[in-house]
Amino acid sequence: MAMLLGASVLILWLQPDWVNSQQKNDDQQVKQNSPSLSVQEGRISILNCDYTNSMFDYFLWYKKYPAEGPTFLISISSIKDKNEDGRFTVFLNKSAKHLSLHIVPSQPGDSAVYFCAAS
């Protein structure tokens, strides 16, 4: 099963970056689409991810701190449009090929690199 990753950075005033998927061709199939995001502690943080392949049926979010490996946060299958786990909620809009991660409330410990993945 192939898995594609995009990444963004959350620095409590979230600094998401564009990252190419790990495809060998130029077609980006998963990408983060927020160039920057400023969030106050206690507010909602929203990270967005778009994908191009309608055959994807499973979507995951990971969090990575410097000098550590990625940690799984939350996932959603293509048969759902919402999944909640504690402060994290992921929304999936299949017709728009878009998913978003909502973090409520934002905390200083949320400052990290966030990865969106699809398979």
From Swiss-Prot:
Matching Gene3D superfamilies: Immunoglobulins (2.60.40.10)
GO biological process, one term: immune response
Pfam families: V-set
Residues the record marks as carrying a glycan: N93
A Gene Ontology cellular-component term: plasma membrane
InterPro entries hit by this protein: Ig-like_dom, Ig-like_dom_sf, Ig-like_fold, Ig_V-set, TCR_variable_domain
Molecular function per GO: MHC protein binding; peptide antigen binding
Domain Ig-like: 22-119
Keywords: Adaptive immunity, Cell membrane, Disulfide bond, Glycoprotein, Immunity, Immunoglobulin domain, Membrane, Receptor, Signal, T cell receptor
Role according to the record: V region of the variable domain of T cell receptor (TR) alpha chain that participates in the antigen recognition. Alpha-beta T cell receptors are antigen specific receptors which are essential to the immune response and are present on the cell surface of T lymphocytes. Recognize peptide-major histocompatibility (MH) (pMH) complexes that are displayed by antigen presenting cells (APC), a prerequisite for efficient T cell adaptive immunity against pathogens.
Annotated PANTHER family: T CELL RECEPTOR ALPHA VARIABLE 1-2 (PTHR19343), T CELL RECEPTOR ALPHA VARIABLE 29_DELTA VARIABLE 5 (PTHR19343:SF24)
Complex and partners: Alpha-beta TR is a heterodimer composed of an alpha and beta chain; disulfide-linked. The alpha-beta TR is associated with the transmembrane signaling CD3 coreceptor proteins to form the TR-CD3 (TcR or TCR). The assembly of alpha-beta TR heterodimers with CD3 occurs in the endoplasmic reticulum where a single alpha-beta TR heterodimer associates with one CD3D-CD3E heterodimer, one CD3G-CD3E heterodimer and one CD247 homodimer forming a stable octameric structure. CD3D-CD3E and CD3G-CD3E heterodimers preferentially associate with TR alpha and TR beta chains, respectively.
Protein name in the entry: T cell receptor alpha variable 29/delta variable 5
UniProt source species: Homo sapiens (Human)
